């Protein structure tokens, strides 16, 4: 369902595009913007849904072209009635006044376009260098309505609906071919153009030609041209001219129709009164803010380059003999004045300068109040005191705050922190704005630690966040206090006083009576309504007693229950013995009997019977009797002699040298004896003990203490001193397994033993 919103405070320079941009993210159908205009800047906007209208209302107080606008809920009936009243007021008015001004409604615009399109034969040429466009019929050849006079009564015409930044040259181009003698622009109380002007022509003939330009375009706006009067010209600052002078000038200077008046301007310009005057004395004033403290008059003259500016037209403001960031500048011409306003937010010495128009009356009033404050009581100059509209230098002069608009109505402080993710913001530095009913406005105030951070944060202006285009504006603390927010007063002392008052129960002092009707999401505001309920502590006495009694009895009940649970642990203490004994009897002993003994019987003995005896029988005996037993012959067996391989060749080491023992000498047998026959005293005693072959096998299969025992047995069986010495070294060194393996392989010449030993490992 379509909903109509009424907008007030729309500046004259703003158009439908600016309104649609202000409501970015909301659905406005085609033809949904109706600008009424007038002194109050009225307009009606149609939104597609109720949700869009509700979110649009929350943006009330925002800025369109640096002008604050107010939004109200309206209806189609009110919109139609307002449009009809404005149209009737314009038609029934005999002569224009300085009162309300307006822009034609949509129905009037369509009617005018149709009427002018049907009279396309009256067109005339237009100066193409002007840069403006007409509606296809020309400026001076429109067929006038029956209700409008075709001939001017005097050389004065009243214009309505002019753009904000219009100047005299634009008006002369608008009346191309006519001799314009002077222009006076009407202004608001703040010094801005209100869209109205009075034009004085050289003659009534030129004024009659100007009436034909009614509802022609100046840029993108329709301009209403009506009959004026000499009284209005004088009232708004013009000088009266004698009638004879007017007739003489009209005869001399009125050019033929269609001829450009450029070569007449100098002569007519010299005889006309001053072309721009305001209600106040001569001059146009601007208010400069956020200036650098080191700036001087020369810097401002360079800043306003191209304007006629002297040091006498510049005035800086001081506080306690210290310069502030404010200044006033007076311009002599409207052109210089418009040039200065176009430099708004231009950076000067690393600071964006804010240039606002101001009237002479307001400037003098501000200076008088400021001078009074300087010479006034020290109470007004104490820290924290701010004037009603402007705050002087100090901390309030620095622009540390940013006013944020166009957030969703339910935005939170955490979301604001995410928007300023590049800046370290605490929740205390963020202030959310709410209406009287506690509904979010989608606006917030954020304070930064320094001006540099605030200026960097302002670069996020018009960045999309949460589906909307967020608008940012850098403001000072004084401007922030106009919202009713003062971060400087929210100090730790005040927070401590609030906490102490809350502990005392004096909840009436938690919030200052001077606090504005703006709600925050702070910690105190969340409990604002609950504090009143907490005052009635009598309602909570009985529940507290009921809860305290059960807290005392349960420990006694559990003390008795703990005694009952002491006996089960005694019963369970015997269980570890039951579990430990089976571990020793059932697991440890069977592991020795079942695993270790079969390992010796099944694995160690069978290889001795099945593998080693066949090797000796099958491989060594067929070699031609080279291998002998341990009782005689050449020591080709384990007891000594040159060890032969399976092929009968003499084995060599990896390097190609003769195989040597560990001690570095010639290769010896296990007993360490040199290569010779075992006879006489060198014959080993093997009676009543294990043979040397069995001891060698056990030596290969054991390590550590068992190996030392085997070496002791070999020492007992060895008679030679050198052999005993070698075995003693082996026993002391605890031979490496690989060394013993290499020694046994060279002595026994068995290759399969490597696989067997590897499997055992």
From Swiss-Prot:
Residues 120-147, 247-278, 372-392, 538-690 are annotated as: Disordered. There is a cross-link at residues 114, 151, 335, 514, 541 (Glycyl lysine isopeptide (Lys-Gly) (interchain with G-Cter in SUMO2)). Pfam families: RRM_1 (PF00076). InterPro entries: ESRP, Nucleotide-bd_a/b_plait_sf, RBD_domain_sf, RBM12B_RRM2, RBM12B_RRM3, RRM4_RBM12B, RRM_dom. It comes from the Eukaryota. GO terms for molecular function: RNA binding. CDD domains: RRM2_RBM12B (cd12746), RRM3_RBM12B (cd12513), RRM4_RBM12B (cd12748). Residues 263-278 have a biased composition (Basic residues). Keywords: Acetylation, Isopeptide bond, Phosphoprotein, Repeat, RNA-binding, Ubl conjugation. The keyword Repeat applies. The keyword Acetylation applies. Residues 247-262, 372-384, 538-621 have a biased composition (Basic and acidic residues). This is RNA-binding protein 12B.
């Amino acid at each position: 369902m379509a909903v109509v919103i009424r907008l007030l405070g729309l500046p004259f320079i703003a158009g439908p595009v600016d309104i649609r941009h202000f409501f970015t993210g909301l659905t406005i159908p085609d033809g949904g913007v109706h600008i009424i205009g007038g002194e109050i800047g009225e307009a009606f906007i149609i939104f597609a849904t109720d949700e869009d209208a509700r979110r649009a209302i929350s943006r009330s107080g925002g800025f369109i072209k640096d002008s604050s606008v107010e939004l109200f809920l309206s209806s189609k009936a009110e919109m139609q009635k307002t449009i009809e009243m404005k149209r009737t007021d314009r038609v029934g008015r005999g002569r224009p006044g300085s009162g309300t001004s307006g822009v034609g409604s949509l129905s009037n615009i369509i009617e005018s376009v149709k009427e002018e399109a049907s009279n396309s034969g009256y067109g005339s040429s237009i100066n193409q260098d002007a840069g403006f466009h007409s509606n296809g019929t020309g400026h001076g050849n429109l067929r006038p309505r029956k209700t409008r006079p075709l001939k001017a009564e005097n050389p004065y015409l009243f214009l309505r609906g002019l753009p904000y930044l219009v100047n005299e040259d634009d008006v002369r181009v608008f009346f191309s071919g006519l001799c314009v003698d002077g222009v006076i622009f009407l202004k608001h109380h703040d010094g801005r153009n209100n869209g109205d002007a009075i034009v004085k022509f050289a003659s009534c003939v030129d004024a009659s030609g100007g009436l034909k330009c009614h509802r022609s375009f100046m840029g993108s706006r329709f301009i209403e041209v009506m009959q004026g009067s000499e009284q209005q010209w004088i009232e708004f600052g013009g000088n009266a001219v004698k009638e004879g002078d007017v007739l003489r000038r009209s005869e001399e200077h009125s050019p033929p129709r269609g001829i450009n008046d450029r070569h007449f301007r100098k002569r007519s310009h010299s005889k006309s009164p001053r072309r721009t005057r305001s209600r106040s004395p001569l001059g146009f004033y601007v208010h400069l803010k956020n200036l650098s403290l080191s700036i001087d008059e020369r810097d401002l003259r360079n800043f306003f380059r191209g304007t006629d500016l002297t040091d006498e037209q510049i005035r800086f403001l001081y506080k306690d003999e210290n310069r502030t960031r404010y200044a006033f500048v007076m311009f002599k011409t409207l052109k210089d004045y418009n040039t200065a306003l176009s430099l708004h937010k231009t950076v000067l010495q690393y600071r964006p300068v804010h240039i606002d128009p101001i009237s002479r009356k307001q400037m003098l009033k501000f200076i008088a109040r400021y001078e009074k404050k300087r010479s006034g009581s020290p109470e007004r100059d104490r820290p924290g005191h701010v004037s009603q509209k402007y705050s002087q230098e100090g901390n309030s002069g620095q622009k540390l705050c940013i006013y944020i608009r166009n957030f969703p109505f339910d935005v939170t402080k955490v979301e604001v922190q995410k928007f300023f993710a590049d800046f370290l913001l605490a929740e205390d530095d963020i202030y959310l704005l709410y209406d009287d009913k506690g509904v979010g406005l989608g606006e917030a105030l954020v304070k930064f630690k320094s001006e540099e951070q605030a200026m960097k944060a302002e670069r996020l202006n018009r960045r999309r966040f949460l589906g909307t285009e967020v608008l940012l504006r850098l403001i000072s603390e004084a401007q922030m206090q106009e919202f009713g927010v003062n971060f400087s007063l929210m100090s730790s002392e005040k927070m401590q006083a609030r906490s102490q008052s809350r502990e005392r129960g004096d909840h009436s002092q938690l919030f200052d009576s001077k606090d504005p009707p703006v709600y925050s999401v702070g910690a105190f505001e969340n409990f604002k309504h609950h504090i009143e309920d907490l005052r009635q502590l009598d309602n909570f006495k009985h529940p507290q007693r009921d809860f305290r009694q059960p807290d005392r009895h349960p420990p006694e009940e559990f003390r008795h229950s703990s005694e009952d649970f002491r006996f089960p642990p005694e019963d369970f203490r015997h269980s570890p013995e039951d579990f430990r004994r089976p571990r020793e009897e059932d697991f440890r002993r069977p592991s020795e009997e079942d695993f270790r003994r079969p390992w010796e019987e099944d694995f160690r003995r069978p290889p001795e019977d099945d593998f080693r005896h066949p090797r000796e029988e099958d491989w060594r005996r067929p070699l031609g009797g080279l291998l002998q037993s341990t009782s005689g012959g050449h020591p080709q067996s384990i007891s000594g002699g040159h060890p032969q391989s399976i092929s009968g060749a003499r084995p060599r080491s990896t390097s190609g040298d003769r195989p040597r023992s560990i001690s570095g000498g010639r290769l010896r047998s296990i007993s360490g004896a040199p290569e010779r026959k075992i006879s006489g005293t060198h014959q080993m005693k093997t009676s009543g003990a294990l043979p040397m072959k069995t001891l060698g096998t056990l030596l290969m299969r054991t390590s550590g203490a068992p190996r030392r025992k085997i070496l002791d047995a070999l020492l007992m069986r060895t008679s030679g001193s050198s052999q005993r010495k070698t075995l003693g070294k082996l026993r002391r060194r605890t031979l490496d397994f690989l060394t013993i393996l290499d020694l046994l392989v060279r002595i026994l010449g068995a290759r399969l033993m490597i696989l067997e030993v590897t499997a055992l490992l």
